[in-house]
């Protein structure tokens, strides 16, 4: 941070002080833990409607579509690229403008427990799962374990949250139960299934 312009940098979170730095420094034991704590505080304070989404495929495309749609209704902030891990998610929150009305966070995982940790940071108002597939099966023994890990998304729902689920997925009932158990007040589904809340009937 010695070379950073103090006019653009008001303070830096550091683990080791830089004696020649011209900007203020906040010395902490773990910069990663400090980043997480800061992002959690921002998530708690914001009045934005918070969307969190995960799934085996389609996360980034769905996030980008949501961003485009929500921007028409108010200031919207979303995960950049696929910065969807334990560093990218806190950064998404710390970079969120104060006037944001809609926050869209893409959450990724490679191990069980990761989605729960990220969900605890965001505390989503609306949580969506695109689908359950074997895209990340390298660290899991079966699709059921992947479904369980993705369902961690609901573990930190804002009270009365909404869950959006893939109706055609073999694990729909499992995900629905997980969402209801977590306190979802509304379940919305999508897909080709005739009982889907929303389904594509015609395309051009």
Named regions from a protein language model:
Residues 1-37:
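N-terminal leader/targeting and accessory segments in enzymes
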Residues 21-24, 182-186:
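A short helix-to-beta-strand connector/capping loop
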Residues 143-147, 177, 184-204:
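Adenine nucleotide phosphate-binding catalytic loops in nucleotide-utilizing enzymes
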Residues 12-20, 167-170, 192-193:
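Short, polar loop motifs at secondary-structure junctions
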Residues 22-28, 92-95, 204:
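Short low-complexity, flexible loop/linker segments enriched in glycine and/or proline
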Residues 33-167, 173-184:
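Phosphate-binding loop of NTP-binding sites
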């Amino acid at each position: 941070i010695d070379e950073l312009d103090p006019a653009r940098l008001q303070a830096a979170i550091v683990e080791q002080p830089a004696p020649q730095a011209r900007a203020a420094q906040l010395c902490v034991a773990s910069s990663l833990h400090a980043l997480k704590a800061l992002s959690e505080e921002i998530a708690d304070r914001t009045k934005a409607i918070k969307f969190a989404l995960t799934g085996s495929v389609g996360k980034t495309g769905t996030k980008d579509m949501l961003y485009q749609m929500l921007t028409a209704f108010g200031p919207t902030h979303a995960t950049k690229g696929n910065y969807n891990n334990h560093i990218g998610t806190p950064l998404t929150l710390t970079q969120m403008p104060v006037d944001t009305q809609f926050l869209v966070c893409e959450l990724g995982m490679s191990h069980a427990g990761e989605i729960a940790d990220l969900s605890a940071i965001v505390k989503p108002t609306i949580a969506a799962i695109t689908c359950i597939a074997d895209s990340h099966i390298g660290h899991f023994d079966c699709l059921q374990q992947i479904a369980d890990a993705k369902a961690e998304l609901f573990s930190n729902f804002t009270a009365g949250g909404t869950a959006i689920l893939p109706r055609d997925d073999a694990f729909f009932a499992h995900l629905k139960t997980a969402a209801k158990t977590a306190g979802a007040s509304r379940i919305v589904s999508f897909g080709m299934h005739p009982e889907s809340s929303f389904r594509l009937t015609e395309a051009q």
